[in-house]
Amino acid sequence: MEEVNVHEDLKGVILYAKPEYDDEVKQDWLILVESIKRERHFRSNDLHIYRHASYGLRNGVFYCGEIPGNWGFANGFKFYLPTEKQKIEFIKKIAKEGYKYISVLNKLVKKT
């Protein structure tokens, strides 16, 4: 898969997190959520955090809503473009399992 850098001020990001965590992944996720909550520019409809089983990548899967059709896997905060088949399978999985989301903020905050 092609790897591209993620701009730290991306808006309209949808971030998917695993519903089941080992302690290390859970800690990383809590750090990320707290970092996002501390940001001052709050717009509830800009960043949606989902509890969703990822493809086994540590920090889950995200979709950048500002760039139409720009789907990606997040591992750390590097961005990987999936195949069309992977996108379709992922959409079907979300539709089937019906995960709820929490609206949080307007940008993805890099983990320190």
Q: Which residues does each PLM region occupy?
A:
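Short intrinsically disordered terminal tails
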Residues: 1-11, 85, 109-112
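Short coil-to-beta transition motif at edge beta-strands of beta-rich domains
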Residues: 4-32
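Intrinsic-disorder/low-complexity loop/linker signature
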Residues: 9-12, 23-25, 47, 60, ...
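Assembly/interface hotspot detector across virion components, adhesins/toxins, and nucleic-acid enzymes
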Residues: 14, 19, 53-55, 99-103, ...
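Mixed-charge, Lys/Arg-enriched low-complexity segments
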Residues: 75-112
